Amino acid sequence: LLQAQFGNAGRGWIAPFKLSKTNEPDDYFISSSVREWVTGRCIQANKKCPVGIGGIGIQSVSPSINLDVRIAPNNGAGYSFNQAILYRGEKAMPMLPAGSFKDSIQTSLATVPAVAGVLADTFRISHPVDTLQLHSTRRKQGTDKLLPASNFKNVYYGFSLTNGYPGVLYHSVGVNGAMYVNYTDEAYVRQLALLKPSLLII
């Protein structure tokens, strides 16, 4: 409703809920050929892996990981994007574009954490798209050297999708069973600030 009145700046935050074996909104899909994930949730007393902005994190020991983002053709209408920011753990394998239009994507891989333990990689696409295919790389940045898989701790948190237009960018975060107290952790609040919210609605 707000985006209809004030403009639509993009889908905003999306997280791999389905890969973490919980409910996912019906306007996007995040899929992977990797089947086994360890999942951390903000509601866990002893978290199985670190959690990110969306209150979850997914972790895999696979030496090769892909993440495919797709906006749902009906429920996601109007949420095409030309920029995606991937939030990952500091020791996670970086991702590079894959698929038919990978050459039209400008990739900026972070070298310095945006906040403690979190890297934010930016993918700028030359035209609006409804899909983004990413595949991990073990190549050391700026070299041809392949690093051993044991060097990495592959934790991924989610994406922020934008379209470059002015308007409302609405981020919805939440985990089944979560309460206010689950979102007051100091580390979580620092991560939430990465989205630069102008208004928080609890």
Protein language model annotation of sequence segments:
Residues 2-107, 111-202:
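Conserved SGNH/GDSL esterase-like catalytic core that processes O-acyl groups on lipids
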